[in-house]
């Protein structure tokens, strides 16, 4: 069974996501709930989407979870679940606005990852979007938009919210990666060996690398790299 996401993408139905969402609503109130009751509610939601093929969307499933929580008498949990959905929607809209203003769809992916890592309200993407909007101008270039976004994050940095500095660095890192990718494409640099050779010819790397390692070894070394470590900021 497939589910339609908000962006139109299709993903395979996973009832574990429903179970996790229900558990989080109880964690938010500190109320205990048995695994059997969670399973019961998951089954009820699952039966609903099985019986209604036209409603197999993330939005409709979440609506059903709300109703299911209330039907079982868990009103406080339903209230927090609704609030959580509202905040997530706010975050999503703020990120989409920034990506639209910068004309950069990949930027949305970066900001979604940031939002998942920095969940405190003080690091809301809504706050970033509002500050960014104060710097943005109609028709500005992609570079200017990214610069404005970095500036927005920097100016949000305070003793109470110091991680905005890290978030600005994450956006700066993304801009650098884009710049490097464009240069690699222009120069036709596809393998790690080609990149090392270019850097050596430019005098940025020492000759010792190419003198001590062959092309196959250097390309193999690239497999040990973990790009996601760039996100440790």
Language model feature labels by segment:
Residues 1-233:
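Extended catalytic cores of very large enzyme megasubunits
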């Amino acid at each position: 069974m497939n589910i339609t996401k908000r962006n139109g993408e299709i993903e395979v139905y996973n009832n574990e996501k429903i179970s996790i969402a229900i558990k989080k609503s109880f964690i938010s109130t500190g109320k205990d709930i048995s695994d059997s009751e969670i399973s019961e509610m998951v089954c009820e939601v699952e039966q609903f989407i099985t019986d209604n093929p036209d409603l197999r969307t993330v939005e409709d499933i979440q609506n059903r979870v709300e109703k299911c929580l209330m039907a079982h008498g868990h009103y406080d949990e339903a209230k927090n679940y609704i609030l959580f959905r509202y905040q997530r929607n706010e975050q999503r809209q703020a990120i989409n606005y920034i990506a639209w203003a910068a004309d950069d769809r990949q930027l949305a992916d970066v900001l979604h990852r940031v939002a998942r890592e920095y969940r405190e309200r003080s690091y809301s993407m809504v706050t970033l979007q509002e500050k960014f909007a104060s710097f943005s101008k109609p028709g500005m270039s992609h570079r200017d938009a990214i610069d404005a976004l970095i500036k927005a994050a920097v100016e949000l940095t305070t003793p109470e919210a110091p991680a905005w500095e890290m978030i600005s660095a994450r956006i700066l890192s993304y801009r650098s990666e884009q710049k490097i990718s464009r240069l690699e494409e222009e120069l036709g640099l596809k393998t790690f060996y080609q990149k090392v050779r270019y850097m050596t010819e430019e005098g940025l790397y020492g000759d010792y690398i190419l003198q001590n390692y062959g092309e196959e070894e250097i390309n193999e070394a690239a497999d040990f790299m973990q790009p996601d470590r760039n996100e440790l900021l």
